[in-house]
Amino acid sequence: LHGIGMGGMDALKGRYLDNGMLDFLIKEREAGRIRNLGFSYHGDIEVYDYLLSRHDEIKWDFVQIQLNYVDWKHAKETNARNTDAEYLYGELHKRGIPSIIMEPLLGGRLSKLNDNLVARLKQRRPESSVASWAFRFAGSFPDILTVLSGMTYMEHLQDNLRTYSPLEPLTDEEMDFLEDTAQLMLKYPTIPCNDCKYCMPCPYGLDIPCLLYTSPSPRDRS
């Protein structure tokens, strides 16, 4: 179920509950026509908590959440509607529900850090890419089913293969290091846009993410 949480409980009831759609999908899974039933979460935490409260009944096979080393503790500082990934993941982990991770690079922002933060990461691991830190973070927790990655070039694929084959989980000290990095990143003025394009198409024909990215106000740069 895609985009669960957008529109709140009213949207959930209208799309999946009141019309019997969720019950139908559960029966289709029982019949073997659906292998895995899950949802991707965006937005309203009331919806997230409600669906997880029914896990014993529904038995979710997976849930897709936004998780990265900034959103882990600072989600609302990047987007006011978001919830800390520490909470989202924690609620899944305690129920034994596998997680699919989206936005491990926070819309690419964690691969395009300013020069000071790049130098900070490179000083620690000169041979590793900036993006690999975020991918290692996303893969370091138990019950992670997969980590999504939007790869544009062959170099991105090769870097991901180096990161995950095999994965070297972050140490506790490296976790603290990335938390400090996140706090430093948030000190720089940014426009909270992840280039998700949910604001598109614009009724006025504007390319909103592109305009924000090229704005004189800093977004990912300092």
List PLM regions with ranges:
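Helical "substrate-binding/catalytic lid" subdomain
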Residues: 204-209, 215
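Beta/alpha (TIM)-barrel catalytic core signal, keyed to glycine-rich beta->alpha loops juxtaposed to Asp/Glu
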Residues: 2-206, 222
